Amino acid sequence: MVKDINEVLREAKSILKANEIDEREARLLLAFSLETTIEKLFIKKDITGIEYNKYIKIIKKRAEGMPYAYITGHKEFMKLDFIVNKNVLIPREDTEILVEETIKLNKKKILDMCTGSGCIAISLAKYIDNAEVEGVDISKRALTIAKLNAKQNNVVVNFINSNLFEEVTSTYDVIVSNPPYIRKKDMENLQKEVTREPEKALDGGEDGLYFYKKIIKEAKKYLNE
């Protein structure tokens, strides 16, 4: 059964609006669902019943709190494309500031602690000439994604599966990190979308500073003079 595309979009927008989600995502998710571009959607008049069912299923997932990036499987960070799924924290725009400030230092040997998707490590490897970058994470599943992202962005990053510095043997010019930072008592009050992200990547202990303190305490042994 063929459905008018504008009616379908109105239905999707209504579902999203009822769940306090930006209505503009309706068109973006339709393009994703149909594997086409936003531009081509404007000349498309209708969709099939199969296409409609697939699309509405996606819209309902979004309405239930599934992050947009987990639905599409991608997130832009530092003008690079990163693969993301439920095993990694979704890269945040705020974290680009950390990358930009590190690039200014122009250091060549860099460690990214708690690398997750690898977005920080990979961005540094991409934008600093001849940089030697390593990324550490306790999650093997996260590192699987990080390795895919390094390959996709044509950079070489050495990823290490380690609980903080336990398996780290090198020294570095600079150590960067965006570790878990949310206070334990605040974990229960997170936005619906954020609760879909890995708890290990969010829970920063009682005061939210557990990992910061551990990293700062141990980092001096791994920094070049």
What are these regions (language model features)?
Residues 4, 8, 51, 138, ...:
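Soluble or luminal CAZymes and related metallo-dependent hydrolases
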Residues 1-34, 39-46:
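Non-catalytic accessory regions of SAM-dependent methyltransferases
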Residues 9, 26-27, 55, 68, ...:
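A general structural signal for well-ordered alpha-helical segments in protein cores
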Residues 96-188, 193:
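Conserved SAM/SAH cofactor-binding pocket of Class I
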Residues 91, 116, 208:
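Short glycine/threonine-rich catalytic loop with a Thr-x-Gly-x-Asp
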